[in-house]
Amino acid sequence: AIVAKAKAANIPVISYDRLILNTADLNYYLSFDNAAVGALQGNALLTAMGAKATLSASVVEINGDPADNNAKLFKQGAHSVLDGKVTIKKEYDTPGWKPENAQTEMQGALTSLGNKVDGVLAANDGTAGGAIAAMKTAGVTPLPPITGQDAELAAIQRILAGEQYMTVYKAIKAEAEAAAQLAYDLAFGVAVPSTMTNGKTVNNGAADIKSVLLTPVAVTKSNIQSTVVADGFWTKADICTSAYASACTAAGIS
């Protein structure tokens, strides 16, 4: 209703971060390439699994909220990489993205699989945290590689501690700046540079919407310094508390 009212008043509409579905009244969609997020996670998991990344492997996939369109795209991206390379023995969609729901899901997977898990595709850092809690409670040692997303502080620290393999960093500042520029151009009738979209569109169920899709970045222990620290997303003081001081030094965080 809000989008329709804006259209009726000749006000441009940008769908920011999440795609508004089933309306042709959008001017632009601006977000990160969410299928690419899932693909980054899938590729990172295969890398971390190494020689275990075979069809005999036991992988658990913990997706996001089934009502969230972004979660659907993350899932598609992950499957585009993992399908045919490993066997996803258990897969869950996690209501509300809640870590406690992910923990319950992982507990069920461990019970079903007899604690044999070679890798966990977790769609974000919250679900990763829930899955890790379940595995610790079950006494899974060593922890299998597990993915994440959002570069949450707790996840960065888990990566340093060796409990989580990776996260996906989405530079919020770059997204906000792109949205501000796009809003300015639309409001003042300035031609939007073709380089912003590079001809990309995303179908929302009603139309192909011109889309600005920013590039997500995989973060592992080796590039925390050059990504989230370099961008000021987290500082050394944030990350390197006493419990993580030696791990920070080893990872070259300054």
PLM segments and residue spans:
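A residue-level marker of the well-folded mature domains of exported/periplasmic proteins
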Residues: 1-254
